[in-house]
Amino acid sequence: MKGLLLKDAYQAWYYAKMVVVAAVVMMGVGVISMMNGANFFIVYAGFLLGMMPMTLLAYDQTSKFNEYSAALPATKEQLVGCKYIVGLCGLVLAEAFAAAALGVAQLHWVAVDSALVISTLVQVGMTTLLSSTILLPLSYRFGYEKAKVGFYFIVGALSALMGFSVAANEDGLVRNLLPQSISSLGLLSIAVVVLTLYALSWRLSVAWYGRAEQ
């Protein structure tokens, strides 16, 4: 298990560095947009970081590592679990970047209050895990190339939400993916549901592991 995680860590550093750079740039833009309470760029940066497990799985399937791994002393749960651990690492990274960006924004903009900060952090976590929750099982079942259709659907859904948000605001700014009136209990419920779906997604990926090669 440790060796698998080290392999994924090396690949993430080698192949996904630009994703981290892009996320940092998005966070920087998000600090500026937060002057009007618009957190879309910070949330979307989390979505980018959440794509790292999919990127690593794509390289595994392209290089036939999934076939070679049959000779390793590792179970399906461990092989699949590594990608989900990478997803959780992406979540921690996204939340850390978002907290830093929100801290800077809170120092400069009156519109950034504690309620908006908490709501934004929940939204970052939700979008960071969203892509892995949906796309990893599809990739293990149908292969990365076919699962990319799901990726395009998610991007389209986020774009649609962005369009609705723009239409709902007179100043044409994208504000929040979630209603600003949602309660703390509602945000906690969303966080619990997202983590539960992430765990169920792992079980589904384990069940479908190896199907894409058949």
Residue ranges of predicted features:
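Hydrophobic alpha-helical transmembrane segments of membrane proteins
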Residues: 1-64, 82-214
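Short helix-to-coil transition segments within interhelical loops
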Residues: 70-76
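Alpha-helix N-cap/helix-start motif at helix boundaries, enriched for small hydrophobics
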Residues: 78-80
